[in-house]
From Swiss-Prot:
Cofactor remark from the record: Binds 1 FMN. Binds 1 [4Fe-4S] cluster.
Name of the protein described by the UniProt record: NADH-quinone oxidoreductase subunit F
UniProt: FMN binding residues: 179-226
Family annotation (NCBIfam families): nuoF_fam, PRK13596.1
Organism: Streptomyces coelicolor (strain ATCC BAA-471 / A3(2) / M145)
InterPro entries on file: ComplexI_51kDa_subunit (IPR050837), NADH-UbQ_OxRdtase_51kDa_CS (IPR001949), NADH-UbQ_OxRdtase_suF (IPR011537), Nuo51_FMN-bd (IPR011538), Nuo51_FMN-bd_sf (IPR037225), Nuop51_4Fe4S-bd (IPR019575), Nuop51_4Fe4S-bd_sf (IPR037207), Soluble_ligand-bd (IPR019554)
Positions annotated to bind NAD(+): 67-76
GO CC term, one of those recorded: respiratory chain complex I
GO MF annotations in UniProt: 4 iron, 4 sulfur cluster binding; FMN binding; metal ion binding; NAD binding; NADH dehydrogenase (ubiquinone) activity; quinone binding
SUPFAM superfamilies: Nqo1 FMN-binding domain-like, Nqo1 middle domain-like, Nqo1C-terminal domain-like
PROSITE patterns referenced in this protein's UniProt entry, alphabetically: COMPLEX1_51K_1, COMPLEX1_51K_2
Catalyzed reactions: a quinone + NADH + 5 H(+)(in) = a quinol + NAD(+) + 4 H(+)(out)
Length: 449
């Protein structure tokens, strides 16, 4: 497990990082209850249980915590939507189905510090009056599944789950559910269908999950990092949380730095930090190379170039620059990377993972792949570039969920910034890039030669 927070915090005079969730990832057995309690674990829960549920929701709302799964919707407001006194059971579902290319923050968090999530779940369930919560985990990550099961067992044994938690009268059952590997189940309503035992496909909304979610009952669906951030807010205070980040995007978050960089890993910092600052503190791009393009929030967000190095990485800053913060998956590519090749691979992923429910997404992603493969192989025509734009435009905003939008984003942005590179594939009858040079071992191979 790589953690860079402690090292950089000690050596960087600006102290740009804000390790909270990742503060003790580098300790031995950081995932255990004993280590978590040494770092004030479950103290936030004690303070939460001393508040009335409605006051707790208002407190989280006032903290300014926004969803960390991509959309950035205020967490407290989502909790507030749950109707009270309706006589129905309420559910909390944690979306841990992290599957998008480049997105890799929730899995390390669950692996290194699962109790932060469990504590956050208990707090959230107390707030929304829920007695049953679920963690929907991506099925392929079996080591994380085992670690989660062990953490849940520890929490039950210590009285943080089960009946009459800490003498508060709160009863809570927590179920860990492993998905079957479908990316579409990361969409909240498809996730609920999957959890109910049906094929994962997005639902028509309204009704929204807050009214009719799991088993047609009021349900809150939150991201792992969103819920795991709640205990620190309760323990250290909303003013402490708001002292970090920006006015409209307060607090800390995990940035996943990957690609052609010298120091890939999870960097926990206040919202509003820039990629330039993150690269400066992590060693920059790999030696001898320069940044060509990057994604601010995973493959589903419009790409940026080196012109955007100083864009504040918060919801407003990235949005104003023409993209989305998304999951803060900062994939960085240097000048050896073929944009057409990268976009083709991403589009192949979306075509494969489309559930097929919506015709624009099902058919559109298929035809995008056919055109991109032809262009990459040197068989394309100039008219194909406008055709790519047209097909992407017919997908964007015309499906039940955002998978189609995610497939269209790289098409629009790559043609905007790198149209000449597409044209070079067509006029030059093939890709001018050597794929081997963009591999992690390319420079080592050249040195040996």
């Amino acid at each position: 497990m790589m953690t860079v927070a402690a090292e950089i915090r000690g050596s960087n005079p600006e102290k740009l990082l804000a390790p909270v969730l990742s503060a003790f990832w580098d300790e031995d057995e950081s995932w255990t209850l004993d280590v978590y309690r040494r770092h004030e674990g479950y103290e936030g829960l004690r303070k939460a249980l001393a508040m009335a549920p409605d006051d707790l929701i208002a407190y989280v709302k006032e903290s300014g915590l926004r969803g960390r799964g991509g959309a950035g919707f205020p967490t407290g407001m989502k909790w507030q939507f749950i109707p009270q006194g309706d006589g129905k059971p309420h559910y909390l579902v944690v979306n841990a189905d992290e599957s998008e290319p480049g997105t890799c923050k929730d899995i390390p968090l669950l692996f290194a510090n699962p109790h932060s999530l469990i504590e956050g779940i208990v707090i959230a369930c107390y707030a929304i009056r829920s007695s049953h919560a679920f963690i929907y985990l991506r099925g392929e990550v079996v080591p994380v599944l085992r670690r989660l099961h062990e953490a849940v067992r520890e929490a039950y044994a210590a009285g943080f789950l089960g009946e009459n938690i800490l003498g508060s009268g709160l009863d809570l059952t927590l179920t860990v559910h492993a998905g079957a590997g479908a990316y579409i189940c990361g969409e909240e309503t498809a996730l609920l269908d999957s959890l109910e035992g049906r094929r994962g496909q997005p639902r028509l909304r309204p009704p929204f999950p807050a009214v009719a979610g799991l088993y047609a009952c009021p349900t809150v669906v939150n991201n792992v990092e969103s819920i795991a951030s709640v205990p620190a807010i309760l323990n250290k205070g909303k003013d402490w949380f708001r002292s970090m980040g920006s006015e409209k995007s307060p607090g800390f978050t995990l940035y996943s730095l990957s690609g052609h960089v010298a120091g890939p890993g999870q960097y926990e910092a206040p919202l509003g930090i820039t990629l330039r600052q993150l690269l400066d503190m992590s060693g920059g791009m790999r030696p001898g190379h320069r940044l060509k393009f990057w994604t601010p929030g995973g493959s589903s967000t419009p790409m940026f170039t080196d012109e955007h190095l100083d864009v504040p990485l918060d919801y407003e800053g990235v949005g104003a620059a023409g993209s989305m913060l998304g999951t803060k998956a900062l994939q960085c590519f240097d000048e050896t990377t073929c944009v057409v090749r990268a976009v083709t691979r991403w589009t192949e992923f979306y075509a494969h993972e489309s559930c097929g429910k919506c015709t624009p997404c099902r058919e559109g992603t298929y035809w995008l792949v056919q055109l991109l493969r032809d262009i990459e192989a040197g068989k394309g025509q100039m008219s194909d570039l406008d055709k790519l734009n047209d097909i992407a435009d017919n997908i964007n905003g015309k499906s039940f969920c955002a998978l189609g939008d995610g497939a269209a984003s790289p098409i629009f942005s790559s043609l905007k910034y790198f149209r000449e590179e597409y044209e070079e594939h067509i006029t030059g009858r093939g890709c001018p890039f050597d794929p081997a040079k963009s591999t992690a071992w390319a420079d080592r191979t050249e040195v040996k030669a």
